[in-house]
Amino acid sequence: MRDGGASDHRRGAGVSDVEGLLRELAPQVLGALVRRYEQFDACEDAVQEALLDAAVQWPEQGLPDNPRGWLVTVASRRIIDHIRSEHARRRREESAAVSVPADAFTAPAPDEERASGQDDTLTLLFLCCHPSLSPPSQLALTLRAVGGLTTAQIASAFLVPEATMAQRISRAKQRIKATGAAFRLPPEGERADRLRVVLHVLYLIFNEGYTATSGPELHRAELTSEAIRLTRAVRRRLPGDGEVAGLLALMLLTEARRPARTGPDGGWSRSPSRTAACGTGGSSRRASSWSATP
């Protein structure tokens, strides 16, 4: 997995390379900011601004030595400006100084982020799949905050108006804020149950993409590919978990069957099948705990 360091990235990357890198780093950066500042909405806005800056600058100026650290630093400056503005507007500098850590007003240096090497993607997934949220809200928030899809893309995938999807995501964020959920992994005693919720959400995203429940398209590739990408991210953090490996195996094997699904002979496509076999890493036997997709 990329750690945002210079060894993985070449300077002068093209626009498509930058877009792919930003998509991968976005949840890591958002997780780092939420962990530090504990303001989901403000952190997401700050990350989006940093991503826009990077999308403009990096194709022209080349990648920074530590792309993830660059994004965290730029986004941190945005959210610090937001915090200061809020404190000034509400005239609560003294009381805020008590509740906000002293280092919250200092953006971390890129080297600090590189040294920490912490990937908060899994923690962010747990937060987006908080049990207080309804399944539709869990799906929408996961695709927005962790998947990096725009509200318009999510609305299009589920064939609802963009305004409706925006309200759903906004209500989900407000609900999480109201519960006071801390940005940390669930306690050991709750982790297995919470992980099952996360995996169920990823399975629902994949299933909706593989067999669309509405619209003219039989298959929505943006959803299946996103579900596979996020499940891979979970497996990187939990390489020994059989349920995670089983779900990934099911997704890869099912997706490998898709090109032949509407073909004339219904046979396997060798190239996708080889990809699936490599990707499962011998874990396909664990997929039996998940319902097979038609």
Put a short name on every predicted segment.
Residues 86, 93-136, 142-153, 160-294:
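Amphipathic helix-loop-helix modules that constitute alpha-helical solenoid scaffolds
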Residues 10-20, 30-49, 57-66, 162-163, ...:
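Short, charged helix-capping/linker segments at alpha-helix termini
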Residues 2-3, 8-31, 41, 189-200, ...:
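A short, charge-rich alpha-helical start-of-domain segment used by transcription regulators
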Residues 21, 32, 140-144:
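Short alpha-helical segment immediately N-terminal to, or the first helix within
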Residues 48-55, 65-94, 173:
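Σ70-family region 2.3-2.4 aromatic/basic alpha-helix that recognizes the −10 promoter
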